[in-house]
Each structure stands twice: as C-alpha cells, then as structure tokens.
C-alpha cells in the first residue's frame, strides 16, 4: 500500500491476464515454487476446503444449493482421491517398494491399495475402527460415483443421465461425513509420516553402530 492506495506487488512471472497478481494482497495466492512445493496431501486439503466453501455458500444463500451440490461433491471426491494417492505413496515409501500409485481415478482401487500396504507394514498406524469407518464412507461415495464423472457432467459419455434415480442430496449431511473422513485420513497421513521418521532414525542409528 502506498499513500493509502493498494498496488500490485512486483512479481517475475509470465504475463497472463487471468492468472496474475492483483492489488488486494490477501487474495494473491502463492503458487509454484513461491508457495510450495506442495504435494498431493496439500492439494487434497484444498479440495476438501473447496467442498466446505461450496456448502457454506449454499447455507448463506450466496448460491442455489441445487447447483452448488455439484462442485461441493466433486471437490470432496477429488480430495479423497488425492489423500488416498498420498497414502499409497507414503506407505510404499515405508515399505521401500519403489512403487507409487496408479494414475487413474478409481477411488475404490486406491483404497484397496492403502489397506493392502498398511497390512504389509505389520504395525497399525491408525485404529481399526477408524479404518473401518473410512472404508464405509469411501465405499458409499464410490458406489455413487465410481468414475469421478457424476458431479462433473450431467451425462456420461454414452449420453446416459447421471443421478437419474436420485431425488435429493443434503449438502450438510455430506459435509459432516466428509469432515469425519478427512479427519481419519489426515491422522493416517501424519501417523505414516511419523513412522517413516522413526524408521529413518532406526536406519541411521544402525548405520552408526556398524561404523
């Protein structure tokens, strides 16, 4: 701000009238190397927050719930997918398999991968009832939208209308259960990170003993 007037911050980046900086500093998002590097977990957090924001907009009558249900549900689904991909990567790192996640949008396959990898570690990083509840919620979502397309387009690639058999979706009910799922998955991510740190400490100490 200069003499009470907000001005754009100087920034060295390619010119683009859409994706550029603005005078309101609080609304300038830090991206790329300026804000990260971000990982799948960070992106997932953003999509969960996006889902919550869409529901809040409906609650505040900023936008019609009949329209906001689509970006809300899509954001939640993508947030789940990104969290699961992050977990697959993290658990593979613990197991030192050298592998990562499949680059597709099959949420239930990602979940099965998480379960298998977690079992292979031989140590419970999160309580069993939490795993069961997460699996239940992911299963419900996958049964409703197995392809990740249901809330993106009104029809599938064959012209069949999505949601033809359904009449109502309460976005607050959806939000509350997505918040519950998010909490479980985030704890799992943090527990996996803590276990990896412990694992590296063990490797380091064993190396020191041999020396």
PLM regions: where:
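Domain-scale activation on soluble regions of proteins
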Residues: 1-211
């Amino acid at each position: 701000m200069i003499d009470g007037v907000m001005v754009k911050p100087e920034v060295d980046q390619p010119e683009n009238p859409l994706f550029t900086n603005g005078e309101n500093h609080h609304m300038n998002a830090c991206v790329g190397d300026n804000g990260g590097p971000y990982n799948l977990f960070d992106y997932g957090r953003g999509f969960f927050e996006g889902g919550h924001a869409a529901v809040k907009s409906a609650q505040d009558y900023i936008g019609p719930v009949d329209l906001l249900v689509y970006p809300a549900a899509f954001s939640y689904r993508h947030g789940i997918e990104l969290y699961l991909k992050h977990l697959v990567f993290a658990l593979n790192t613990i197991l030192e398999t050298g592998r990562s996640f499949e680059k597709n949008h099959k949420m239930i396959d990602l979940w099965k991968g998480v379960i298998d990898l977690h079992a292979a570690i031989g140590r419970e990083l999160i309580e069993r009832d939490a795993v069961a509840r997460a699996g239940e919620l992911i299963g419900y979502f996958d049964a409703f939208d197995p392809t990740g397309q249901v809330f993106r387009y009104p029809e599938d690639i064959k012209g069949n209308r999505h949601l033809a058999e359904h009449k109502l979706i309460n976005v607050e009910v959806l939000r509350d259960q997505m918040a519950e799922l998010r909490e479980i998955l985030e704890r799992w991510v943090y527990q996996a990170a803590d276990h990896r740190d412990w694992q590296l400490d063990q490797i380091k100490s064993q190396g020191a003993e041999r020396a």
